[in-house]
Amino acid sequence: MRYEERKRAGSGPKSVRRLHLTKCSSRARYLVAFTILLVGAAALAQSLYKYQDENGEWIFTDMPPEDQQAAEIRDLPTGSKPPSVSVSTRIVDREFQFIAKNDYYAPVEVVLALDELTNVRHPTADQVMRWVVDPRSEMILLGLTTTGTDPEPAARFRFMSLFGDPRSRHDPPRPYRAPFPVAASYNITQAYPYGVTHDTADSRYAVDIAMPVGTDIHAARGGIVFEVASTNFRGGTDPDRDAASANIVRILHDDGTHAVYAHLNWNSIRVKPGDTVERGQYIADSGNTGFTSGPHLHFAVLQNVGMRIESVPVVFEGPDSRGIEPAMGQVLTAY
């Protein structure tokens, strides 16, 4: 099923805008406007019902079974606040500074737009208003000279942010490992160029692999985990209701691209942001969460190409380390 990187599966990286009116004094007062990039990892505290349907399939839902059959009831934890990217301002020695803070274990691209400046000199016409902020860091984006104190220097501004460094280039050292146990084989139900629902730039080269709920998912390539959503348990074909309820793992690669593993099972993810994972490492169980018509894994490798996310073609490792291009209807085996 469709997994739009900016809209689907509970929180893909998306451009965000915020309008701020900030006044700063020489005491360097801060007004920090937090911009949440990811939603969906946090869930309200509620009950989970687990039971088997008439076909013996395990059902995870927030509704009790209609026929009064026995069901296991669990309390779901309240999710923690996801990381964020923020831009704040301060005055230091008559310089009006714009500071970006990136809480993620991945770089983010930030674009700043200045709508109104009061007693602050405008940047020069050739000033580039786009930066890449390193993981888990703060960066002074811009420093402008103040021109007075009455009224206090102020700025009205907007910013957008997106995962990834646009200077990155997809350069895997070897074909990707099929993301499930060695010697197992599963059908590819969607792959380029026959994407039934993969019709956006960020999903064009995504691969959907049908597999039973609970199948071990292994990292197709090593890297650093920078986002996890694990508390969702609902799946369905209603985009308004289900789009933001997929469990996912994102892993940053050393070439600046990242992989997303989506529709994972409830409470099955075995990694956390900041973890370094190796190729082939067990990271989660497959599931049927989010916008989906049936159990499968959605796998894609993504790249920031300048405030825009695009998927890139992937090749899986086959026999004798030979590269295999995924195709719809193909049986993929892990080696």
How should these model regions be labeled?
Residues 40-42:
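N-terminal signal peptide c-region/cleavage motif recognized by signal peptidases
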Residues 249, 278-290:
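Short hydrophobic beta/alpha edge segments that flank linear recognition/processing sites
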Residues 1-27:
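N-terminal secretory signal peptides that target proteins for export/translocation
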Residues 173-189, 218, 241-244, 269-278, ...:
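Acidic, glycine-rich catalytic/binding loops that coordinate metals and/or anionic ligands
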Residues 3-6, 24, 44-97, 103-140, ...:
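Short, cationic interaction patches enriched in Lys/Arg with P/S/T/G and frequent prolines
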Residues 232-241, 286-298:
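Active-site loop architecture of trypsin-fold serine endopeptidases
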Residues 212, 218, 255-280:
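Short histidine-centered loop motifs in beta-beta connectors
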Residues 128-245:
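Surface-exposed, glycine-biased beta-strand/turn segments
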